[in-house]
């Protein structure tokens, strides 16, 4: 049986960020996903940031996350929202090329030390060593 320091189940945005940070800290990390080709798949309105989310994206970036870095590599348009109002309510939004983002995220994860496992997590047994 293989030993991992961390096993992340699900490769959505949060799962990718969790696996990324664990890998950066040198932890042996496995990332389980049903379909590797779905890594980095964005919603139908692919954007990062905006009025309510710019601060969250910035915090993830400052803490070593990857979403903004991959977003910058995949952006097709940037806009600062609410410029007619004060700086306290400005929000940067990047429109993202969905296919390019997925391609860049897959490349990033596959060049890391994260072990991708294409499977389902059905029955978990935790063994303390």
Put a short name on every predicted segment.
Residues 127-129:
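Conserved small/polar residues in nucleotide/adenosyl-binding loops
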Residues 2-12:
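Beta1/beta-strand and adjacent pyrophosphate-binding region of the FAD-binding site
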Residues 20-121:
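Conserved N-terminal/central alpha/beta ligand/cofactor-binding core
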Residues 15:
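N-terminal Rossmann-fold NAD(P) dinucleotide-binding loop
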């Amino acid at each position: 049986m293989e030993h991992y320091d961390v096993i992340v189940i699900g490769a959505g945005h949060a799962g990718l960020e969790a696996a990324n940070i664990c890998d950066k800290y040198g932890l042996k990390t496995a990332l389980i996903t049903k379909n590797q080709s779905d890594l980095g798949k964005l919603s139908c309105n692919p954007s990062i940031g905006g009025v309510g989310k710019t601060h969250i994206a910035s915090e993830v970036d400052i803490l070593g996350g990857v979403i903004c870095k991959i977003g910058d590599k995949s952006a097709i348009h940037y806009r600062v929202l609410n410029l007619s109002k004060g700086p306290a309510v400005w929000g940067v939004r990047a429109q993202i090329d969905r296919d390019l983002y997925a391609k860049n995220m897959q490349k990033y994860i596959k060049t890391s030390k994260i072990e991708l496992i294409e499977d389902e997590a059905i029955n978990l047994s935790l063994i303390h060593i």
